[in-house]
């Protein structure tokens, strides 16, 4: 997808994600350092499905998220993710995802990765981290910005819906 289309979709997404984050999440962001511009790898834990929204809201700059391929199979969402330049991570095809992320990093972009690869256990703790962050950092030389997400489940508003 062209850079112009990615930037246009990002421009449309910012107010949508911001509205969602500010409406559905109680965010308390504490920065211990300024987030630099340019190529970087943002590595965050993954306690809930809302984490990409949280990280996007925190960064205030375009980023490309490494996302499980399952979400790319959802009809409208998948099309949006592809056209926005996000990176599909398909089981057994990790090198393809790494290569796509390395291209973004070489272009000076920000990559967001959830090292666990899946949502953390609901009872706390985390899954074993995969090697993607280290591989990207070693191959690209880009700095890694660690992000810790402390989730208080009561601070997430739940909206029930049924699709018929």
Regions found by a protein language model. Give the residues of each.
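Catalytic-site beta-strand/loop segments enriched in glycine and acidic/polar residues
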Residues: 104-133
């Amino acid at each position: 997808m062209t850079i112009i289309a990615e930037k246009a979709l990002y421009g449309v997404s910012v107010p949508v994600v911001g509205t969602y984050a500010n409406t559905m999440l109680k965010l308390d962001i504490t920065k211990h350092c300024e987030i630099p511009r340019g190529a970087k790898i943002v590595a965050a834990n993954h306690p809930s499905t809302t984490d990409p929204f949280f990280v996007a809201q925190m960064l205030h700059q375009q980023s490309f998220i490494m996302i499980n391929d399952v979400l790319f199979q959802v009809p409208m969402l998948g099309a949006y993710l592809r056209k926005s330049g996000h990176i599909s991570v398909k089981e057994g095809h990790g090198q393809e995802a790494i290569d796509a992320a390395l291209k973004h990093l070489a272009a000076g972009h920000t990559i967001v990765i959830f090292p666990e690869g899946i949502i953390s256990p609901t009872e706390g703790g985390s899954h074993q981290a995969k090697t993607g962050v280290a591989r990207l950092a070693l191959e690209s030389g880009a700095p890694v910005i660690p992000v810790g997400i402390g989730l208080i489940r009561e601070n997430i508003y739940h909206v029930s819906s049924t699709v018929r």
